[in-house]
Amino acid sequence: VANYESYIENWVHEIKKPLSLMTLLLDNRKDEMSPLVHTRMLYVRDHTRQNVEQILYFSRLGAVHKDYYFEPLPILETCKEAVEDNLSLLEEAHFSVTYSGNNCTAISDKKGFMFILGQIISNSVKYAAHDATPAIHFSVSDNKEIGQIVLSICDNGTGIPASDLPFVFDKGFTGDVGSYLSRSTGMGLYLVQQMASDLTIKIDIHSNTNGGTTVILTFPKVERPLGR
């Protein structure tokens, strides 16, 4: 297992080199490309980066020692950061992105949370509606009665059939032919659920065929020690 983890880490390190070179090229030679080519190249880069991150996090989830760093995170601002990281994917699909709620703070690991957000955004792009302007909305609320922060991420995409909903977090599950998940590898939502479990974030999905999908992330209540 240790050799496997080491191999994955080294492989990811090596593939990030051409991705970094690609980023440098896209930044420095933008004027030499047509806007369409530049946008498409950004899309390819970000899509490749997401696939690499999936492999990396899949290997890390099975590790004995995990280097999570829990800190206060402004949830809405972190969502905006994740959108910025995936902007080329969203722009290529002509997405409308909106936000609501207060910028509540929750305790979590930023890298792990950003990975979750990236996978959810990627799914929204992959299964965007074709008969309307694709849209994704981030909403944060603070349930003061139970001390929990709730983040809802809603899109207006193709949705998930009711028969598939109980299995969307199963490893390798891709749904029926033509469904929301049929074009996927069956790993994205599995990794999201595993990462959420590690970070003690409760995750729920509500969806209807052609009715969009809502992912709800509930952050745990953290008891703060009283000052002396």
Roles of regions detected by a PLM:
Residues T133-G147:
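Short beta-strand/loop element within the Bergerat-fold HATPase_c
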Residues L89-Y99:
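Short conserved segments within the C-terminal catalytic ATPase subdomain
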Residues D155:
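Acidic ATP/Mg2+-coordinating residue in the GHKL
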Residues I160-G172:
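Short conserved segment of the HATPase_c
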Residues S124-A128:
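Short helix-loop "hinge" at the ATP-lid/N-box region of the Bergerat-fold HATPase_c
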